[in-house]
Amino acid sequence: SDGRNDAAKAFDLISSTVKKGCCSHPACAGNNQHICGRRR
């Protein structure tokens, strides 16, 4: 099987966690714009 699928799933899981937690904090969101988006 292709390991990239597992990596993608792990990345999605991390990203969703970061979106819920980090992205609600302006300083953290600013450091993770590639995940959180650039809205303020």
Curated annotation (Swiss-Prot):
**Propeptide residue intervals:** 1-20
Region: Ser-Xaa-Pro motif, crucial for potent interaction with nAChR, residue numbers: 24-26
Q: What's this chain's function?
A: Alpha-conotoxins bind to the nicotinic acetylcholine receptors (nAChR) and inhibit them. This toxin reversibly blocks neuronal nAChRs (alpha-3/beta-2 = alpha-6 or -3/beta-2 or -3 > alpha-3/beta-4 = alpha-4/beta-2).
Cystine residue pairs: C22-C28, C23-C36
Record-linked InterPro entries: Conotoxin_a-typ (IPR009958), Conotoxin_a-typ_CS (IPR018072)
Q: Give a brief account of the tissues where this protein occurs.
A: Expressed by the venom duct.
Q: Which UniProt keywords apply?
A: Acetylcholine receptor inhibiting toxin, Amidation, Cleavage on pair of basic residues, Disulfide bond, Ion channel impairing toxin, Neurotoxin, Postsynaptic neurotoxin, Secreted, Toxin
Give a Pfam family name.
Toxin_8
Native source species:
Conus geographus (Geography cone)
Q: Which GO terms describe its molecular function?
A: acetylcholine receptor inhibitor activity; ion channel regulator activity; toxin activity
Return the protein name: Alpha-conotoxin GIC
Which residues does this entry mark as bearing Cysteine amide? C36
**Organism lineage string:** Eukaryota, Metazoa, Spiralia, Lophotrochozoa, Mollusca
Please provide the record's free-text comment about the domains of this protein. Answer: The cysteine framework is I (CC-C-C). Alpha4/7 pattern.
Q: Determine the domain of life of the protein's source.
A: Eukaryota
